[in-house]
Protein backbone atom coordinates (compact mmCIF):
# COMPACT_ATOMS: atom_id res chain seq x y z
CA UNK A 1 0.00 0.00 0.00
CA UNK A 2 1.21 3.53 -0.85
CA UNK A 3 2.74 5.52 1.99
CA UNK A 4 0.68 8.23 3.69
CA UNK A 5 2.83 11.05 5.09
CA UNK A 6 2.12 13.46 7.94
CA UNK A 7 2.60 17.18 7.23
CA UNK A 8 2.81 20.07 9.68
CA UNK A 9 1.99 23.06 7.45
CA UNK A 10 3.24 25.85 9.69
CA UNK A 11 3.13 29.64 9.54
CA UNK A 12 6.91 30.02 9.47
CA UNK A 13 8.22 26.46 9.02
CA UNK A 14 6.78 23.18 7.77
CA UNK A 15 7.80 19.58 8.38
CA UNK A 16 7.01 16.15 6.90
CA UNK A 17 7.27 12.74 8.56
CA UNK A 18 6.38 9.13 7.78
CA UNK A 19 6.01 5.80 9.61
CA UNK A 20 8.91 3.42 8.99
CA UNK A 21 9.20 0.07 10.70
CA UNK A 22 6.48 1.05 13.14
CA UNK A 23 8.29 4.26 14.17
CA UNK A 24 7.71 7.84 12.97
CA UNK A 25 10.63 9.38 11.04
CA UNK A 26 11.10 13.05 10.15
CA UNK A 27 12.17 13.43 6.51
CA UNK A 28 14.97 15.89 5.72
CA UNK A 29 14.43 18.15 2.71
CA UNK A 30 16.64 18.35 -0.40
CA UNK A 31 18.82 20.93 1.35
CA UNK A 32 19.41 18.56 4.29
CA UNK A 33 17.21 20.36 6.86
CA UNK A 34 14.48 18.65 8.88
CA UNK A 35 12.17 21.68 8.64
CA UNK A 36 11.37 23.77 5.56
CA UNK A 37 10.59 27.51 5.74
CA UNK A 38 6.99 28.16 4.60
CA UNK A 39 8.27 30.70 2.09
CA UNK A 40 7.64 30.94 -1.66
CA UNK A 41 9.36 33.40 -4.01
CA UNK A 42 9.18 34.21 -7.70
CA UNK A 43 12.64 35.05 -9.05
CA UNK A 44 13.33 37.59 -11.79
CA UNK A 45 14.21 34.80 -14.22
CA UNK A 46 10.75 33.28 -13.73
CA UNK A 47 11.79 30.45 -11.38
CA UNK A 48 9.60 29.53 -8.42
CA UNK A 49 11.66 29.14 -5.25
CA UNK A 50 10.38 27.31 -2.17
CA UNK A 51 11.81 26.92 1.32
CA UNK A 52 15.33 27.84 2.37
CA UNK A 53 16.39 29.24 -1.03
CA UNK A 54 13.28 31.45 -1.13
CA UNK A 55 13.96 32.76 2.36
CA UNK A 56 17.63 33.51 1.57
CA UNK A 57 16.79 35.89 -1.29
CA UNK A 58 13.95 37.68 0.53
CA UNK A 59 15.95 40.84 1.29
CA UNK A 60 16.73 41.43 -2.39
CA UNK A 61 13.25 40.48 -3.61
CA UNK A 62 10.76 41.46 -0.86
CA UNK A 63 7.77 42.16 -3.14
CA UNK A 64 7.89 38.67 -4.66
CA UNK A 65 8.66 36.68 -1.51
CA UNK A 66 5.63 35.30 0.31
CA UNK A 67 5.80 34.18 3.95
CA UNK A 68 3.32 33.79 6.87
CA UNK A 69 0.60 33.09 4.27
CA UNK A 70 -1.12 30.78 6.77
CA UNK A 71 -2.41 33.95 8.46
CA UNK A 72 -4.47 34.72 5.34
CA UNK A 73 -5.67 31.25 4.35
CA UNK A 74 -9.45 30.79 4.41
CA UNK A 75 -10.07 34.37 5.53
CA UNK A 76 -11.85 37.39 4.05
CA UNK A 77 -9.83 40.50 3.21
CA UNK A 78 -11.67 42.70 5.71
CA UNK A 79 -10.54 40.33 8.47
CA UNK A 80 -6.82 40.64 7.75
CA UNK A 81 -6.34 44.35 7.05
CA UNK A 82 -3.90 44.75 9.97
CA UNK A 83 -1.78 41.75 8.97
CA UNK A 84 -1.77 42.94 5.35
CA UNK A 85 0.26 46.01 6.36
CA UNK A 86 2.85 43.96 8.26
CA UNK A 87 4.28 42.00 5.33
CA UNK A 88 6.65 43.14 2.58
CA UNK A 89 4.38 41.97 -0.25
CA UNK A 90 1.06 43.39 -1.45
CA UNK A 91 -2.12 41.86 -0.05
CA UNK A 92 -5.18 42.70 -2.15
CA UNK A 93 -8.94 42.20 -2.04
CA UNK A 94 -10.45 40.22 -4.89
CA UNK A 95 -14.21 40.11 -4.47
CA UNK A 96 -13.68 40.31 -0.72
CA UNK A 97 -11.24 37.38 -0.75
CA UNK A 98 -7.51 37.66 -0.08
CA UNK A 99 -5.02 37.63 -2.96
CA UNK A 100 -1.27 38.31 -2.87
CA UNK A 101 0.30 40.21 -5.76
CA UNK A 102 3.57 39.17 -7.40
CA UNK A 103 4.95 41.74 -9.85
CA UNK A 104 7.73 39.27 -10.75
CA UNK A 105 5.28 36.55 -11.77
CA UNK A 106 2.88 39.12 -13.22
CA UNK A 107 -0.14 37.67 -11.45
CA UNK A 108 -2.07 37.40 -8.20
CA UNK A 109 -2.23 34.26 -6.08
CA UNK A 110 -4.70 32.97 -3.51
CA UNK A 111 -3.08 32.00 -0.18
CA UNK A 112 -4.06 28.38 -0.94
CA UNK A 113 -1.90 28.48 -4.08
CA UNK A 114 1.16 29.67 -2.15
CA UNK A 115 0.60 27.02 0.54
CA UNK A 116 0.18 24.40 -2.20
CA UNK A 117 3.70 25.15 -3.45
CA UNK A 118 5.10 24.50 0.04
CA UNK A 119 3.09 21.26 0.29
CA UNK A 120 4.29 20.16 -3.13
CA UNK A 121 7.95 20.60 -2.13
CA UNK A 122 7.40 18.63 1.09
CA UNK A 123 5.75 15.78 -0.81
CA UNK A 124 8.45 15.78 -3.51
CA UNK A 125 11.19 15.58 -0.85
CA UNK A 126 9.28 12.74 0.85
CA UNK A 127 8.89 10.92 -2.49
CA UNK A 128 12.65 11.11 -3.13
CA UNK A 129 13.38 9.82 0.38
CA UNK A 130 10.91 6.92 0.13
CA UNK A 131 11.67 6.04 -3.50
CA UNK A 132 7.98 6.10 -4.40
CA UNK A 133 5.47 8.78 -5.35
CA UNK A 134 3.57 10.15 -2.36
CA UNK A 135 -0.01 11.21 -3.13
CA UNK A 136 -1.73 10.98 0.26
CA UNK A 137 -1.19 12.98 3.44
CA UNK A 138 -2.56 13.93 6.82
CA UNK A 139 -2.21 17.71 7.29
CA UNK A 140 -2.37 19.52 10.61
CA UNK A 141 -4.11 22.83 11.37
CA UNK A 142 -4.39 24.95 14.52
CA UNK A 143 -7.14 23.63 16.81
CA UNK A 144 -8.93 26.96 16.54
CA UNK A 145 -9.03 26.99 12.72
CA UNK A 146 -12.66 27.37 11.65
CA UNK A 147 -14.52 25.56 8.87
CA UNK A 148 -13.41 27.87 6.08
CA UNK A 149 -9.74 27.71 7.09
CA UNK A 150 -9.87 23.91 7.33
CA UNK A 151 -11.48 23.68 3.91
CA UNK A 152 -8.92 26.11 2.47
CA UNK A 153 -6.12 23.90 3.83
CA UNK A 154 -7.72 20.88 2.14
CA UNK A 155 -7.95 22.91 -1.07
CA UNK A 156 -4.24 23.74 -0.84
CA UNK A 157 -3.55 20.01 -0.64
CA UNK A 158 -5.76 19.39 -3.65
CA UNK A 159 -3.94 22.11 -5.64
CA UNK A 160 -0.66 20.42 -4.69
CA UNK A 161 -1.97 17.13 -6.05
CA UNK A 162 -2.36 15.55 -2.63
CA UNK A 163 -5.31 13.54 -1.42
CA UNK A 164 -5.80 14.93 2.09
CA UNK A 165 -6.80 11.86 4.09
CA UNK A 166 -7.49 13.82 7.27
CA UNK A 167 -7.16 17.29 8.76
CA UNK A 168 -6.13 17.02 12.43
CA UNK A 169 -5.48 19.60 15.11
CA UNK A 170 -1.85 20.45 15.86
CA UNK A 171 -1.99 19.97 19.67
CA UNK A 172 -3.75 16.64 19.15
CA UNK A 173 -1.02 15.54 16.74
CA UNK A 174 1.59 16.58 19.32
CA UNK A 175 -0.15 14.44 21.95
CA UNK A 176 -0.03 11.45 19.58
CA UNK A 177 3.73 11.88 19.25
CA UNK A 178 4.16 12.30 23.00
CA UNK A 179 1.94 9.40 24.05
CA UNK A 180 2.57 6.94 21.19
CA UNK A 181 4.53 4.45 23.33
CA UNK A 182 2.93 5.23 26.70
CA UNK A 183 0.84 2.58 28.40
CA UNK A 184 -0.08 4.36 31.64
CA UNK A 185 -2.88 6.92 31.63
CA UNK A 186 -1.91 10.58 31.91
CA UNK A 187 -3.72 13.88 31.72
CA UNK A 188 -1.59 16.23 29.63
CA UNK A 189 -1.78 19.85 28.57
CA UNK A 190 -0.33 20.70 25.16
CA UNK A 191 0.90 24.31 24.97
CA UNK A 192 1.41 25.03 21.26
CA UNK A 193 2.84 28.47 20.45
CA UNK A 194 3.97 28.50 16.84
CA UNK A 195 4.87 31.15 14.30
CA UNK A 196 1.38 32.55 13.85
CA UNK A 197 -1.08 30.65 16.03
CA UNK A 198 -1.53 29.57 19.65
CA UNK A 199 -3.44 26.52 20.83
CA UNK A 200 -3.95 24.84 24.18
CA UNK A 201 -5.47 21.37 24.47
CA UNK A 202 -6.10 19.21 27.51
CA UNK A 203 -6.09 15.46 26.79
CA UNK A 204 -6.28 12.10 28.47
CA UNK A 205 -3.59 9.89 26.96
CA UNK A 206 -2.80 6.24 27.55
CA UNK A 207 -2.98 2.71 26.17
CA UNK A 208 -3.65 3.90 22.63
CA UNK A 209 -6.56 6.21 23.46
CA UNK A 210 -6.10 9.96 22.93
CA UNK A 211 -9.16 11.87 24.12
CA UNK A 212 -9.29 15.65 23.87
CA UNK A 213 -11.13 17.03 26.91
CA UNK A 214 -10.99 20.71 25.94
CA UNK A 215 -9.27 23.07 23.54
CA UNK A 216 -8.76 26.82 23.43
CA UNK A 217 -6.53 29.26 21.62
CA UNK A 218 -5.81 32.41 19.66
CA UNK A 219 -5.44 32.17 15.88
CA UNK A 220 -3.44 35.39 15.77
CA UNK A 221 -0.73 34.98 18.37
CA UNK A 222 2.67 33.54 17.59
CA UNK A 223 6.35 34.10 16.91
CA UNK A 224 5.57 36.61 14.14
CA UNK A 225 4.02 38.90 16.76
CA UNK A 226 7.13 38.69 18.94
CA UNK A 227 9.27 39.56 15.88
CA UNK A 228 6.99 42.51 15.13
CA UNK A 229 7.57 43.92 18.63
CA UNK A 230 11.33 43.88 18.05
CA UNK A 231 10.95 45.37 14.55
CA UNK A 232 8.82 48.24 15.90
CA UNK A 233 11.28 48.87 18.74
CA UNK A 234 14.30 48.96 16.40
CA UNK A 235 12.48 51.10 13.83
CA UNK A 236 11.30 53.59 16.47
CA UNK A 237 14.81 53.89 17.95
CA UNK A 238 16.25 54.46 14.47
CA UNK A 239 13.54 57.02 13.65
CA UNK A 240 14.35 58.96 16.83
CA UNK A 241 18.07 58.89 16.06
CA UNK A 242 18.01 59.44 12.30
CA UNK A 243 14.53 60.75 11.48
CA UNK A 244 13.87 57.88 9.04
CA UNK A 245 11.12 55.25 9.38
CA UNK A 246 12.66 52.04 8.06
CA UNK A 247 9.24 50.36 7.93
CA UNK A 248 8.39 52.37 4.82
CA UNK A 249 11.28 50.80 2.90
CA UNK A 250 10.40 47.21 1.93
CA UNK A 251 14.00 46.01 1.71
CA UNK A 252 14.88 47.63 5.04
CA UNK A 253 11.74 46.12 6.61
CA UNK A 254 12.72 42.67 5.36
CA UNK A 255 16.23 43.04 6.83
CA UNK A 256 14.75 44.28 10.13
CA UNK A 257 12.35 41.31 10.26
CA UNK A 258 15.15 38.79 9.69
CA UNK A 259 17.36 40.53 12.29
CA UNK A 260 14.46 40.55 14.79
CA UNK A 261 13.86 36.80 14.36
CA UNK A 262 17.59 36.11 14.77
CA UNK A 263 17.78 38.28 17.93
CA UNK A 264 14.70 36.58 19.40
CA UNK A 265 16.26 33.15 18.89
CA UNK A 266 19.58 34.29 20.39
CA UNK A 267 17.83 35.72 23.47
CA UNK A 268 16.54 32.25 24.34
CA UNK A 269 20.11 31.23 25.22
CA UNK A 270 21.93 34.51 25.98
CA UNK A 271 20.90 37.62 27.93
CA UNK A 272 21.62 40.14 25.19
CA UNK A 273 21.83 40.20 21.40
CA UNK A 274 23.75 42.53 19.09
CA UNK A 275 21.79 43.77 16.07
CA UNK A 276 24.08 45.13 13.40
CA UNK A 277 22.66 46.10 10.00
CA UNK A 278 25.16 48.09 7.93
CA UNK A 279 23.91 50.21 5.03
CA UNK A 280 20.30 49.78 6.18
CA UNK A 281 19.39 52.97 4.30
CA UNK A 282 20.97 56.09 2.86
CA UNK A 283 20.39 59.85 2.72
CA UNK A 284 22.09 62.66 0.84
CA UNK A 285 24.62 62.65 3.68
CA UNK A 286 25.60 59.08 2.90
CA UNK A 287 24.78 55.54 4.09
CA UNK A 288 23.18 54.86 7.48
CA UNK A 289 23.88 51.87 9.70
CA UNK A 290 21.80 50.29 12.46
CA UNK A 291 23.79 49.07 15.45
CA UNK A 292 21.88 48.28 18.66
CA UNK A 293 21.90 45.96 21.64
CA UNK A 294 18.70 44.25 22.78
CA UNK A 295 18.65 42.68 26.24
CA UNK A 296 16.43 39.78 27.25
CA UNK A 297 14.84 42.00 29.92
CA UNK A 298 13.92 44.64 27.30
CA UNK A 299 12.58 41.95 24.96
CA UNK A 300 10.37 40.57 27.74
CA UNK A 301 9.16 44.08 28.53
CA UNK A 302 8.26 44.67 24.86
CA UNK A 303 6.39 41.36 24.66
CA UNK A 304 4.70 41.44 28.09
CA UNK A 305 1.21 41.85 26.59
CA UNK A 306 1.75 38.92 24.18
CA UNK A 307 2.98 36.67 26.97
CA UNK A 308 -0.01 37.67 29.08
CA UNK A 309 -2.35 36.74 26.20
CA UNK A 310 -1.05 33.17 26.51
CA UNK A 311 -2.60 32.97 29.98
CA UNK A 312 -6.28 33.23 28.96
CA UNK A 313 -6.55 30.11 26.71
CA UNK A 314 -4.72 27.98 29.32
CA UNK A 315 -7.18 29.00 32.04
CA UNK A 316 -10.12 28.56 29.64
CA UNK A 317 -9.05 25.04 28.62
CA UNK A 318 -8.67 23.96 32.26
CA UNK A 319 -12.11 25.37 33.10
CA UNK A 320 -13.74 23.65 30.12
CA UNK A 321 -12.06 20.34 31.03
CA UNK A 322 -13.27 20.83 34.64
CA UNK A 323 -9.74 20.31 35.91
CA UNK A 324 -7.36 22.12 38.23
CA UNK A 325 -3.67 22.59 37.53
CA UNK A 326 -2.94 19.85 40.09
CA UNK A 327 -4.75 17.36 37.83
CA UNK A 328 -2.28 17.88 34.96
CA UNK A 329 0.42 15.19 34.89
CA UNK A 330 2.57 16.64 32.10
CA UNK A 331 2.83 19.88 30.11
CA UNK A 332 4.07 19.36 26.55
CA UNK A 333 5.60 22.37 24.78
CA UNK A 334 5.08 22.62 21.02
CA UNK A 335 6.25 25.26 18.53
CA UNK A 336 9.50 27.19 18.30
CA UNK A 337 8.12 30.13 20.30
CA UNK A 338 7.96 27.95 23.43
CA UNK A 339 11.76 28.22 23.57
CA UNK A 340 11.35 31.82 24.81
CA UNK A 341 12.32 31.74 28.52
CA UNK A 342 9.48 34.10 29.54
CA UNK A 343 6.94 31.76 27.90
CA UNK A 344 8.39 28.75 29.73
CA UNK A 345 8.26 30.71 32.99
CA UNK A 346 4.61 31.62 32.36
CA UNK A 347 3.76 27.93 31.82
CA UNK A 348 5.58 27.02 35.03
CA UNK A 349 3.76 29.75 37.00
CA UNK A 350 0.35 28.84 35.55
CA UNK A 351 0.60 25.08 36.03
CA UNK A 352 3.00 24.79 38.95
CA UNK A 353 5.36 22.37 37.22
CA UNK A 354 8.33 22.31 34.89
CA UNK A 355 7.18 21.70 31.30
CA UNK A 356 8.18 18.44 29.64
CA UNK A 357 10.87 19.12 27.04
CA UNK A 358 11.51 15.57 25.83
CA UNK A 359 9.89 16.26 22.43
CA UNK A 360 11.31 18.47 19.69
CA UNK A 361 8.88 21.42 19.50
CA UNK A 362 9.62 21.97 15.79
CA UNK A 363 8.99 18.37 14.73
CA UNK A 364 6.50 16.88 17.18
CA UNK A 365 3.38 17.95 15.23
CA UNK A 366 4.61 16.35 11.99
CA UNK A 367 5.53 13.20 13.93
CA UNK A 368 1.98 13.02 15.34
CA UNK A 369 0.52 13.58 11.87
CA UNK A 370 2.66 10.67 10.60
CA UNK A 371 1.26 8.42 13.34
CA UNK A 372 -2.30 9.37 12.32
CA UNK A 373 -1.30 8.76 8.69
CA UNK A 374 -0.06 5.32 9.78
CA UNK A 375 -3.44 4.63 11.40
CA UNK A 376 -5.31 5.61 8.22
CA UNK A 377 -2.85 3.69 6.04
CA UNK A 378 -3.19 0.54 8.13
CA UNK A 379 0.43 0.54 9.39
CA UNK A 380 -0.51 1.46 12.95
CA UNK A 381 -3.19 -0.28 15.00
CA UNK A 382 -4.50 0.15 18.52
CA UNK A 383 -4.75 3.96 18.31
CA UNK A 384 -8.05 5.76 18.96
CA UNK A 385 -8.11 9.53 18.50
CA UNK A 386 -11.07 11.49 19.91
CA UNK A 387 -10.87 15.18 18.99
CA UNK A 388 -13.32 18.03 19.68
CA UNK A 389 -14.91 21.07 18.03
CA UNK A 390 -13.58 24.29 19.61
CA UNK A 391 -16.71 26.50 19.42
CA UNK A 392 -20.44 25.99 19.90
CA UNK A 393 -22.59 25.77 16.77
CA UNK A 394 -26.28 26.54 16.48
CA UNK A 395 -29.07 28.45 14.75
CA UNK A 396 -30.95 31.69 15.30
CA UNK A 397 -34.43 31.23 16.74
CA UNK A 398 -37.36 33.55 17.50
CA UNK A 399 -36.32 36.76 19.21
CA UNK A 400 -32.76 36.69 17.90
CA UNK A 401 -31.68 33.99 20.36
CA UNK A 402 -28.89 31.54 19.49
CA UNK A 403 -30.02 27.98 20.11
CA UNK A 404 -26.93 25.78 20.47
CA UNK A 405 -27.09 22.43 18.73
CA UNK A 406 -23.47 21.33 19.22
CA UNK A 407 -21.76 22.76 22.35
CA UNK A 408 -18.04 23.57 22.23
CA UNK A 409 -15.64 20.75 23.13
CA UNK A 410 -18.02 18.11 21.74
CA UNK A 411 -16.14 15.03 20.52
CA UNK A 412 -16.04 14.76 16.71
CA UNK A 413 -17.14 13.36 14.36
CA UNK A 414 -20.65 14.07 15.62
CA UNK A 415 -24.18 14.46 14.34
CA UNK A 416 -26.91 16.20 16.31
CA UNK A 417 -30.39 17.39 15.45
CA UNK A 418 -33.18 19.56 16.83
CA UNK A 419 -36.80 19.90 15.70
CA UNK A 420 -38.12 23.43 15.18
CA UNK A 421 -41.35 24.84 13.80
CA UNK A 422 -42.79 27.87 12.02
CA UNK A 423 -43.39 31.26 13.65
CA UNK A 424 -46.52 32.42 11.78
CA UNK A 425 -49.64 30.84 10.31
CA UNK A 426 -49.33 29.73 6.69
CA UNK A 427 -45.54 30.04 6.60
CA UNK A 428 -44.22 28.13 3.57
CA UNK A 429 -40.48 28.55 4.08
CA UNK A 430 -37.91 28.99 6.83
CA UNK A 431 -34.51 30.64 6.70
CA UNK A 432 -31.86 28.71 8.64
CA UNK A 433 -29.19 31.06 10.03
CA UNK A 434 -26.11 29.09 11.14
CA UNK A 435 -24.05 30.58 13.98
CA UNK A 436 -20.74 29.93 15.76
CA UNK A 437 -19.86 31.24 19.22
CA UNK A 438 -20.68 31.24 22.91
CA UNK A 439 -23.09 34.18 23.43
CA UNK A 440 -26.85 33.93 24.06
CA UNK A 441 -27.88 36.14 21.12
CA UNK A 442 -27.37 35.74 17.39
CA UNK A 443 -25.99 39.25 16.88
CA UNK A 444 -23.19 38.60 19.39
CA UNK A 445 -22.02 35.46 17.57
CA UNK A 446 -20.36 34.85 14.21
CA UNK A 447 -22.66 34.23 11.25
CA UNK A 448 -21.46 31.26 9.19
CA UNK A 449 -24.18 31.45 6.56
CA UNK A 450 -27.90 31.09 5.83
CA UNK A 451 -30.03 28.88 3.63
CA UNK A 452 -33.75 28.54 2.92
CA UNK A 453 -36.05 25.53 3.10
CA UNK A 454 -39.02 26.10 0.75
CA UNK A 455 -42.13 24.13 -0.03
CA UNK A 456 -43.56 23.77 3.48
CA UNK A 457 -47.34 23.18 3.17
CA UNK A 458 -49.33 26.11 4.68
CA UNK A 459 -50.39 25.25 8.23
CA UNK A 460 -51.01 26.96 11.58
CA UNK A 461 -47.80 28.08 13.22
CA UNK A 462 -46.15 25.45 15.37
CA UNK A 463 -47.60 22.56 13.34
CA UNK A 464 -44.86 21.92 10.72
CA UNK A 465 -41.88 20.01 12.05
CA UNK A 466 -38.51 21.12 10.66
CA UNK A 467 -35.59 18.90 11.64
CA UNK A 468 -32.24 20.72 11.55
CA UNK A 469 -29.21 18.38 11.52
CA UNK A 470 -25.64 19.51 12.26
CA UNK A 471 -23.00 17.06 11.05
CA UNK A 472 -19.29 17.63 11.78
CA UNK A 473 -16.89 15.20 10.12
CA UNK A 474 -13.53 14.01 11.43
CA UNK A 475 -11.86 16.99 9.72
CA UNK A 476 -13.97 19.40 11.77
CA UNK A 477 -15.89 20.57 8.68
CA UNK A 478 -19.59 21.30 9.20
CA UNK A 479 -22.62 20.38 7.10
CA UNK A 480 -26.13 21.54 8.02
CA UNK A 481 -29.36 20.01 6.70
CA UNK A 482 -32.96 21.12 7.24
CA UNK A 483 -35.80 18.69 6.49
CA UNK A 484 -39.57 19.11 6.60
CA UNK A 485 -40.68 15.91 8.34
CA UNK A 486 -44.12 16.20 6.73
CA UNK A 487 -43.10 16.39 3.07
CA UNK A 488 -39.59 14.96 3.25
CA UNK A 489 -38.20 18.02 1.45
CA UNK A 490 -34.71 18.99 2.54
CA UNK A 491 -32.01 21.58 1.91
CA UNK A 492 -28.39 21.64 3.05
CA UNK A 493 -25.35 23.88 3.29
CA UNK A 494 -21.67 23.05 3.73
CA UNK A 495 -20.04 25.82 5.73
CA UNK A 496 -16.94 26.19 3.59
CA UNK A 497 -17.04 29.59 1.90
CA UNK A 498 -18.63 31.61 4.67
CA UNK A 499 -16.93 34.63 6.19
CA UNK A 500 -14.73 33.35 8.99
CA UNK A 501 -13.79 34.48 12.46
CA UNK A 502 -12.06 37.79 12.98
CA UNK A 503 -8.70 38.24 14.70
CA UNK A 504 -9.94 38.35 18.27
CA UNK A 505 -13.45 37.00 17.79
CA UNK A 506 -13.02 33.56 19.32
CA UNK A 507 -11.40 34.44 22.63
CA UNK A 508 -13.55 37.59 22.82
CA UNK A 509 -16.71 35.46 22.43
CA UNK A 510 -15.74 33.16 25.28
CA UNK A 511 -14.52 36.00 27.51
CA UNK A 512 -17.58 38.19 26.89
CA UNK A 513 -19.89 35.22 27.34
CA UNK A 514 -18.56 34.83 30.89
CA UNK A 515 -18.53 38.57 31.64
CA UNK A 516 -22.04 39.05 30.31
CA UNK A 517 -23.53 35.78 31.53
CA UNK A 518 -25.89 37.53 33.95
CA UNK A 519 -27.19 40.20 31.56
CA UNK A 520 -27.43 37.66 28.73
CA UNK A 521 -29.53 35.39 30.93
CA UNK A 522 -31.85 38.26 31.89
CA UNK A 523 -32.31 39.32 28.26
CA UNK A 524 -32.95 35.74 27.21
CA UNK A 525 -35.57 35.27 29.95
CA UNK A 526 -37.34 38.46 28.78
CA UNK A 527 -37.51 37.15 25.22
CA UNK A 528 -38.74 33.77 26.45
CA UNK A 529 -41.50 35.48 28.48
CA UNK A 530 -42.49 37.50 25.40
CA UNK A 531 -42.58 34.39 23.19
CA UNK A 532 -44.52 32.52 25.88
CA UNK A 533 -47.10 35.33 26.16
CA UNK A 534 -47.54 35.53 22.39
CA UNK A 535 -48.02 31.77 22.21
CA UNK A 536 -50.52 31.83 25.09
CA UNK A 537 -52.58 34.58 23.42
CA UNK A 538 -52.68 32.57 20.20
CA UNK A 539 -53.72 29.43 22.12
CA UNK A 540 -56.46 31.35 23.96
CA UNK A 541 -57.98 32.69 20.72
CA UNK A 542 -57.87 29.22 19.20
CA UNK A 543 -59.56 27.69 22.27
CA UNK A 544 -62.38 30.27 22.27
CA UNK A 545 -62.96 29.65 18.57
CA UNK A 546 -63.10 25.87 19.01
CA UNK A 547 -65.43 25.97 22.04
CA UNK A 548 -67.76 28.59 20.50
CA UNK A 549 -71.09 28.97 22.37
CA UNK A 550 -70.05 26.58 25.13
CA UNK A 551 -68.10 29.44 26.76
CA UNK A 552 -70.24 31.78 28.92
CA UNK A 553 -70.29 35.36 27.57
CA UNK A 554 -68.70 36.77 30.75
CA UNK A 555 -65.78 34.32 30.57
CA UNK A 556 -65.37 34.97 26.85
CA UNK A 557 -65.27 38.76 27.36
CA UNK A 558 -62.72 38.41 30.16
CA UNK A 559 -60.40 36.17 28.10
CA UNK A 560 -60.69 38.41 25.02
CA UNK A 561 -59.83 41.47 27.13
CA UNK A 562 -56.80 39.77 28.64
CA UNK A 563 -55.65 38.58 25.18
CA UNK A 564 -55.95 42.16 23.86
CA UNK A 565 -54.00 43.60 26.81
CA UNK A 566 -51.34 40.89 26.59
CA UNK A 567 -50.85 41.42 22.85
CA UNK A 568 -50.40 45.17 23.48
CA UNK A 569 -47.84 44.44 26.21
CA UNK A 570 -45.96 42.13 23.82
CA UNK A 571 -46.02 44.76 21.07
CA UNK A 572 -44.64 47.39 23.49
CA UNK A 573 -42.17 44.87 24.99
CA UNK A 574 -43.51 45.82 28.43
CA UNK A 575 -41.94 43.06 30.52
CA UNK A 576 -43.71 44.02 33.77
CA UNK A 577 -47.15 43.85 32.13
CA UNK A 578 -46.25 40.56 30.42
CA UNK A 579 -45.27 39.07 33.81
CA UNK A 580 -48.56 40.31 35.32
CA UNK A 581 -50.97 39.40 32.51
CA UNK A 582 -49.59 35.97 31.51
CA UNK A 583 -50.63 34.18 34.75
CA UNK A 584 -53.97 36.05 34.72
CA UNK A 585 -54.76 34.74 31.24
CA UNK A 586 -53.61 31.24 32.24
CA UNK A 587 -56.02 31.32 35.22
CA UNK A 588 -58.86 32.62 33.04
CA UNK A 589 -58.34 29.78 30.55
CA UNK A 590 -58.13 27.31 33.43
CA UNK A 591 -61.51 28.58 34.67
CA UNK A 592 -63.04 28.24 31.18
CA UNK A 593 -61.83 24.64 30.97
CA UNK A 594 -63.16 23.82 34.45
CA UNK A 595 -66.60 25.28 33.65
CA UNK A 596 -66.86 23.30 30.41
CA UNK A 597 -66.08 20.03 32.25
CA UNK A 598 -68.56 20.86 35.04
CA UNK A 599 -71.28 21.59 32.45
CA UNK A 600 -70.55 18.19 30.92
CA UNK A 601 -70.84 16.58 34.34
CA UNK A 602 -67.09 15.92 34.77
CA UNK A 603 -64.57 17.21 37.32
CA UNK A 604 -62.21 20.10 37.04
CA UNK A 605 -59.62 19.88 34.34
CA UNK A 606 -56.23 20.78 35.63
CA UNK A 607 -53.98 21.69 32.76
CA UNK A 608 -56.90 22.38 30.44
CA UNK A 609 -54.94 25.32 29.18
CA UNK A 610 -51.22 25.46 28.74
CA UNK A 611 -49.79 26.56 32.07
CA UNK A 612 -46.45 27.64 30.73
CA UNK A 613 -47.64 29.23 27.53
CA UNK A 614 -45.32 26.88 25.68
CA UNK A 615 -44.93 26.46 21.99
CA UNK A 616 -47.79 25.26 19.90
CA UNK A 617 -46.02 22.53 17.99
CA UNK A 618 -47.05 18.95 18.31
CA UNK A 619 -44.36 17.84 20.72
CA UNK A 620 -44.57 20.97 22.85
CA UNK A 621 -40.83 21.25 23.33
CA UNK A 622 -39.79 22.68 19.98
CA UNK A 623 -38.38 26.14 19.56
CA UNK A 624 -39.57 28.22 16.63
CA UNK A 625 -37.49 29.67 13.87
CA UNK A 626 -38.07 33.34 13.07
CA UNK A 627 -38.92 33.77 9.41
CA UNK A 628 -37.62 37.33 9.24
CA UNK A 629 -33.94 36.59 8.81
CA UNK A 630 -31.67 38.74 6.69
CA UNK A 631 -29.55 36.92 4.20
CA UNK A 632 -25.82 36.75 4.96
CA UNK A 633 -23.83 37.93 1.98
Curated annotation (Swiss-Prot):
Molecular function GO labels: ATP binding; ATP-dependent protein folding chaperone; unfolded protein binding
Record key words, sorted: ATP-binding, Chaperone, Nucleotide-binding, Phosphoprotein, Stress response
Residue spans of biased composition, Low complexity class: 606-619
Regulation: induction: By stress conditions e.g. heat shock.
Annotated stretches, region: Disordered: 513-534, 598-633
Acidic residues bias: start-end ranges: 620-633
Modified residues (Phosphothreonine): 197
InterPro entries from the UniProt entry: ATPase_NBD (IPR043129), Chaperone_DnaK (IPR012725), Heat_shock_70_CS (IPR018181), HSP70_C_sf (IPR029048), HSP70_peptide-bd_sf (IPR029047), Hsp_70_fam (IPR013126)
UniProt KW Transmembrane keyword: no
Classification via Pfam families: HSP70
Family: Belongs to the heat shock protein 70 family.
NCBIfam families: PRK00290.1, PRK05183.1, prok_dnaK
Functional description taken from the UniProt entry: Acts as a chaperone.
Name of protein: Chaperone protein dnaK2
Gene for this chain: dnaK2
Amino acid sequence: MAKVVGIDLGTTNSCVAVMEGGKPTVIANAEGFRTTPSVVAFAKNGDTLVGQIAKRQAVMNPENTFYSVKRFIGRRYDEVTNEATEVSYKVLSSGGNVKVDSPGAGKQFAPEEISAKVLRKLVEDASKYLGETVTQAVITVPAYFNDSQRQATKDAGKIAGIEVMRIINEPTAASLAYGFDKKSNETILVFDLGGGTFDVSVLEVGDGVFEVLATSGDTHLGGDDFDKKIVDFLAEQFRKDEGIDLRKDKQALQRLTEAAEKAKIELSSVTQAEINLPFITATQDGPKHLDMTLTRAKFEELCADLIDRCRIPVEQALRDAKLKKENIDEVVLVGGSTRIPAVQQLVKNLLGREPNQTVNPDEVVAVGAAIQAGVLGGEVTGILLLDVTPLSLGVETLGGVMTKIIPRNTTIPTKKSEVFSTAVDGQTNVEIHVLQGEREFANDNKSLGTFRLDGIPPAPRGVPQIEVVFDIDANGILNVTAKDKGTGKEQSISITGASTLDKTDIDRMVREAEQNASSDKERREKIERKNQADSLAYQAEKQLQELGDKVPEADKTKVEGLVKDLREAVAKEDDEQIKKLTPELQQALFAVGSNIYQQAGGGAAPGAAPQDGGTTSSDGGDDVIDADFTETK
